[in-house]
Amino acid sequence: IQSTSMDQGILTEDSMNSFIRTLIQAGIWKNKVPKQTARTKDGTQTTVKKTEAEADAMVSKDTRLSFQPIVSVDAELLRQQRRFSSPRVLLSENTPLEPPPLYLTEEPTVLNRTSRRKREGKSHRGEYSVCDSESRWVTDKSSAVDIRGHQVTVLGEIRMGPS
């Protein structure tokens, strides 16, 4: 912001408060307009403030450079982070030695929800299942095990409404 000799009169408190509000709203007060050094005709250096447009261009350029999206996570970052115990996720720079237990459908313990109780106490590296599930419809079962471990009968047909 540049001022001329005509603008350098005494300012009242209200006009100063109004001026500060305008600066804050414009974001200039917070960012502080950078100064440039320039030489006058006689060779002495003076400080000249950049124009508002130049300052805005610099601020927007700096903003774009500082907010770049993160594409990948560096292994050094994983080493620096404090290790934590989580039942679902383990951050590691090494790949797991075996696939997670969720995808091992050959095991009979994976087929129902009570298998979570059986898996407790084991430590696995890699992914953990939030819940056990099957990714296909089962149409030919007449009995099943509920979440409490009790044997229940599966209804072949469900009647709705008055009969």
Curated annotation (Swiss-Prot):
tRNA-binding recorded as keyword: no
Residues making up the signal peptide according to the UniProt record: 1-3
Subcellular location: Secreted
Keywords from the named record: Cleavage on pair of basic residues, Glycoprotein, Growth factor, Secreted, Signal
GO molecular function term, any single one: nerve growth factor receptor binding
One of the protein's GO biological processes: nerve development
Top-level taxon of the source organism: Eukaryota
Main location: secreted
Task performed by this protein: Seems to promote the survival of visceral and proprioceptive sensory neurons.
Family: Belongs to the NGF-beta family.
Descriptive protein name: Neurotrophin-3
Organism: Eryx johnii (Indian red sand boa)
Gene: NTF3
